[in-house]
Regions:
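Residues that flank catalytic or metal-binding motifs in active/ligand-binding sites
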Residues: 58-60, 95, 184, 197, ...
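A glycine-rich, often tryptophan-bearing local segment used as a flexible ligand/cofactor-contacting loop or short
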Residues: 157-246
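Well-ordered beta-strand positions enriched in small/hydrophobic/aromatic, beta-favoring residues
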Residues: 14, 99, 145, 201, ...
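Intrinsic-disorder/low-complexity accessory segments
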Residues: 1-136, 141-169, 173, 178, ...
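A residue-level signal for beta-strand positions that form part of recognition/binding surfaces
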Residues: 3, 61, 98, 200, ...
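Catalytic beta-strand/loop cores that center a nucleophilic Ser/Cys/Thr
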Residues: 222-326, 331, 335
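Short, surface-exposed amphipathic charged segments that create phosphate/polyanion-binding patches used
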Residues: 55, 143-145, 216-223, 279-285
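Short catalytic/ligand-binding loop motif for oxyanion handling, primarily in non-cytosolic enzymes
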Residues: 154, 188-191, 212, 273-274, ...
């Protein structure tokens, strides 16, 4: 049977498809219809294609068998697709994820609301779980736990979950599913070496030396240098031997790797802008209201001195293993979108979330 190939090459700050979120919406629609969908992570040079008879190189994409039902979904989503008689064996088979979205006391609405929008516009399904749900062991019915940002470095999670909830999360990651945490959610699995901090899970060999001093840095726009350009979360983001991403930072952890079960995928490199002169952005942030809030409406502005002292060279994005499952930890906020390079809804930064979820689904 013929194969369909959905290219997803990086083209500047966008991709070769018309819409980043729209393409993932179609991919999830295919998965939800039971279509076998594979992620082709390695680049392929074709001698000829229907669109490029002289031959063409594609960086990455998605593979499925040709069918009328699949074509209907692809056509309805206006997704560009190539047809081939045969293709190299793809890297991973993708599966629908049953996501537990934490919305207990530790989930700050200003951080969880944009993450909900990012998931919805790409057709990722999820269910909210409360502190009570977690404490009662209901995480066992899910494939992964997604923890959004919080207003502090972890104590708010403990205020709702307590020891029982923390033990349920540890057991879930060890025995049942994966974990993705953003900002405060990236603090939660860290290990503290201070007796007065019972608010982290202590399940990965990474820490923040400032411990619970959530307000030690501030908010601003940062450039993160990608350490592992071949990691799947950077698919359609990293290209060539050196790549970076520009993201909103809002008091996230400066992670320091302390052991072998965690590795840095990207590190803080440059402070681009903040709400303090002379670093106030001189460009239009368009419809990205969260980026505006991080710069104009937050009292604690990230300064060059604080960036150098607290963040420069520290781990910004990490991957960890805990027993049989994986954790992805994002200190900056990919769900807050771009820094004024285009419409918020088409932010390339969302790929850290979309790719991350697909990566976890394939494990």
């Amino acid at each position: 049977m013929a194969k369909l190939f959905i290219p997803f090459d990086r083209v500047g700050l966008m991709t070769c498809q018309k819409s980043i979120s729209g393409t993932f919406q179609v991919l999830n629609a295919l998965l939800n219809q039971g279509v076998e969908l594979f992620w082709q992570r390695d680049g392929i040079r074709f001698l000829e294609t229907p669109a490029w008879p002289e031959g063409h190189y594609y960086q990455c994409g998605f593979v499925l068998e040709d069918s009328i039902s699949a074509r209907d979904i692809l056509d309805a989503g206006d997704v560009f697709v190539e047809q081939f008689a045969d293709l190299p064996e793809p890297t991973w088979r993708l599966r629908p994820l049953n996501i537990a979205f934490y919305n207990g006391r530790g989930a700050e609405d200003e951080f969880s609301a944009p993450l909900v929008k990012v998931l919805q516009q790409a057709n990722f399904s999820y269910n909210f779980v409360s502190d009570k749900d977690v404490r009662e062991g209901k995480l066992k019915g899910f494939d992964m736990l997604l923890v959004p940002g919080s207003p502090d470095a972890g104590e708010c999670y403990y205020a709702g979950l307590g020891d029982k909830g923390y033990n349920q999360i540890r057991s879930f990651i060890a025995d049942h599913g994966h974990y993705m945490g953003i900002c405060g959610g990236a603090y939660l699995p860290l290990s503290s070496y201070h007796d007065k901090n019972p608010y982290w899970l202590n399940i990965v060999n990474a820490t923040d030396q400032e411990d619970l001093d959530y307000w030690r840095a501030g908010s601003g726009f940062v450039r993160c240098r990608i350490n592992d350009d071949m990691h799947p979360i950077f698919s359609s983001v990293a290209l060539g031997h050196s790549s970076s991403m520009d993201l909103v930072f809002w008091e996230g952890p400066a992670m320091q790797i302390m052991g072998e079960n965690v590795r840095s995928l990207a590190h803080f490199e440059t402070l681009l802008a903040s709400g303090k002169d002379p670093l106030k952005p001189h460009w239009d942030l368009l419809d990205n209201h969260m980026a505006v809030d991080a710069i104009k409406d937050f009292y604690n502005c990230l300064t060059p001195e604080l960036f150098t002292k607290m963040l420069h060279g520290k781990c910004a994005i990490a991957e960890a293993d805990y027993h049989r499952h994986k954790l992805l930890l994002y200190s900056p906020h990919p769900e807050m979108g771009n820094l004024g390079t285009g419409p918020w809804a088409e932010s390339r930064n969302f790929l850290l979330i979309y790719n991350g979820l697909f990566y976890l689904s394939a494990q």
